[in-house]
Amino acid sequence: MNIDIANQLRAAKKATTDLNLIQSDTRTIILKTLAANLEKHIENIIQENQKDLSLMLEQDPRYDRLLLNKERILSLANDVRKVADLPNPLGVNLLEKSMPNGLSIKKITVPLGVIAVIYESRPNVTIDIFSLCFKSGNVCILKGGKEAHFTNSYLLLLIKNTLKNFNINTDIVCLLPPERALMTQLLNATGLVDLCIPRGSQNLINFVRDNAKIPVIETGAGIVHTYFDKSGDLGKGKKIINNAKTRRVSVCNALDTLIIHADRLKDLPELVETLSQKNVIIYADQDAYQVLDKNYPKQLLIKAKPQDFGHEFLDYKLAIKTVPNIKAAIDHIQQFSSHHSEAVIAEDESAIDKFLTEVDAAAVYANASTSFTDGGEFGLGAEIGISTQKVHARGPMGLDALTSYKWVIRGTGQIRN
């Protein structure tokens, strides 16, 4: 292991003791101070962010994820305050019982320990991760991408300066160099890192999963479907599809494939009408293509190929699949889904119940945009990631997902026969 990384990781592991001694009220005050410092240094943050943006083409899908402006920084500070005001997740009594032999047994929440997060493009993640880890008593190791190096470095400086003002050990957070070559060393840090959470492309997630010797929670990759049922309301459908696809195309909860019941193909031109105003390219299957051929701009309409389905576009692109019934829609989703977010637009309650019950995803929706799959929107304050697996957490991961538990047993001298 590279000596510099080894030293950082050992210092981080040692700092868990100091972090556990910080009272909950103090953590809250420190986070609110950090939020104020973010607002105070908006211009400096933007200046550093511009250095990163200047090295990337505006047409790059990552550009929007990398961008920090005044509005986004204020929103970020507000998210930190929301996390600060959340109930303390530590020391929560999950179970308590008195045994016949007189033993008192409790099951209480505790921090996971040292959490490493590997992420790409989004510098706001740096603040989100720290605030959630700090509130939940976890040391955090940050491994951002080189494309956000200037922004991440400045945000880390703000965090550490805030901690110094309260005489807090700054080793409770560290930012590793952005070089990808160091990732394998981090993933092999058994005994020093308790959990790794990759946030980014499917390639990044696959690399981490396949090479890690430390526990991993997969997050981020979203191949998202919305099924417009035979009973779907056209007005709701237009709004939901437009929002899910175009609100922010670069996020993991953005719509990738629209599945439509064959009996509603006549409504397809109206369903996607607003998408053309934002130059959304549609990859339509044969039935959908025939309907849209004279009702959607030709330069934006392409005949779908097999590889267009099961693809996370992260761009102004949408695949359309026609199905004869809801079973075929669910089968298509189960084949191509990344188990992130899936939605149905329907008025038939039996169709809604079938979809919500049978579709295997972290978040399933009826008559709402998948854009809501987000820690803040779920009332979690912020999220460290959106887990697409079932153990140890699923969906948006807030404070509770960053805790484990331990058993506390009190006795009066009991021994076991």
Swiss-Prot record:
Reaction(s) catalysed (UniProt annotation): L-glutamate 5-semialdehyde + phosphate + NADP(+) = L-glutamyl 5-phosphate + NADPH + H(+)
Compartment list: Cytoplasm
PROSITE patterns the UniProt entry points to: PROA
EC number: 1.2.1.41
InterPro entries cross-referenced by the UniProt entry: Ald_DH/histidinol_DH, Ald_DH_C, Ald_DH_N, G-glutamylP_reductase_CS, Glu-5-SA_DH, GPR_dom
Predominant location category: cytoplasm
GO cellular component: cytoplasm
A GO MF term: NADP binding
Enzyme class, UniProt record, top EC level: oxidoreductase
Keyword hit for Transferase: no
Keywords recorded for this protein, A-Z: Amino-acid biosynthesis, Cytoplasm, NADP, Oxidoreductase, Proline biosynthesis
Pathway note: Amino-acid biosynthesis; L-proline biosynthesis; L-glutamate 5-semialdehyde from L-glutamate: step 2/2
Keyword NADP: yes
Function: Catalyzes the NADPH-dependent reduction of L-glutamate 5-phosphate into L-glutamate 5-semialdehyde and phosphate. The product spontaneously undergoes cyclization to form 1-pyrroline-5-carboxylate.
Cited PANTHER family: DELTA-1-PYRROLINE-5-CARBOXYLATE SYNTHASE, GLUTAMATE SEMIALDEHYDE DEHYDROGENASE
Name listed for the protein in its UniProt record: Gamma-glutamyl phosphate reductase
Taxonomic source organism: Legionella pneumophila (strain Corby)
